[in-house]
């Protein structure tokens, strides 16, 4: 009985406030990962941008350092060259991508806020990577619709990373599945949404976490049922679901 009581207390503690960036239940363990294998191997330009972004009032929006490392290696493993990113913020994941793709690789990057992108742009420029990036300011859906209408972009993307408005993830997926190549990957970020996907309905949550929670749950259910893709959900960062197009 004592063990069960301790377990219940632990579970209650985890749900005191849903909204922690790391999904690991031990902050010490997460810090160990960062200090042992992430920070020592982090490129200097990514470290600079990470530290710059940490001063931003909305720094929680950035891709975590361990996820940036994961994306960088993943892109190298699949030999990605033509990529897309929806939701850029200050550009940490964008920089991880630019470092991974070849010299003639391209990233179509879209965000509604150019100011945040330009905060990190000097770091990207100093690293000599700006030529790989085409940045478009504004909502991504009209751009995607135009690309699909043009017809020449179907199945042309090796990798697409989405870290934007969660209430549009389903709408993005409907379009991106046409633009990614067969065998290519789409990565949806925040699919475990601060752990809120398994939190009790009455658990205290930050307002933005509670607002987007149902949209994330809807996406996860839709991806699991989509016969056009293979999926893998990973507890990296705030949860990332990789979708490999198979048809």
UniProtKB/Swiss-Prot annotation:
GO terms for biological process: lignin biosynthetic process; methylation. S-adenosyl-L-methionine binds at residues 63, 85, 87-88, 93, 111, 140, 165. Binds 1 divalent metal cation per subunit. InterPro entries: Cation-dep_OMT, SAM-dependent_MTases_sf, SAM_O-MeTrfase. It catalyses: (E)-caffeoyl-CoA + S-adenosyl-L-methionine = (E)-feruloyl-CoA + S-adenosyl-L-homocysteine + H(+). Its cofactor is a divalent metal cation. Its EC number is 2.1.1.104. One of its GO terms (molecular function) is caffeoyl-CoA O-methyltransferase activity. Substrate binds at residues 21, 163, 194. Keywords: Lignin biosynthesis, Metal-binding, Methyltransferase, S-adenosyl-L-methionine, Transferase. A divalent metal cation binds at residues 163, 189-190. SUPFAM superfamilies: S-adenosyl-L-methionine-dependent methyltransferases. It holds the Pfam family Methyltransf_3. Pathway: Aromatic compound metabolism; phenylpropanoid biosynthesis. Methylates caffeoyl-CoA to feruloyl-CoA and 5-hydroxyferuloyl-CoA to sinapoyl-CoA. Plays a role in the synthesis of feruloylated polysaccharides. Involved in the reinforcement of the plant cell wall. Also involved in the responding to wounding or pathogen challenge by the increased formation of cell wall-bound ferulic acid polymers. Belongs to the class I-like SAM-binding methyltransferase superfamily. Cation-dependent O-methyltransferase family. CCoAMT subfamily. This is Caffeoyl-CoA O-methyltransferase 2. It comes from Populus trichocarpa (Western balsam poplar). The gene is CCOAOMT2.
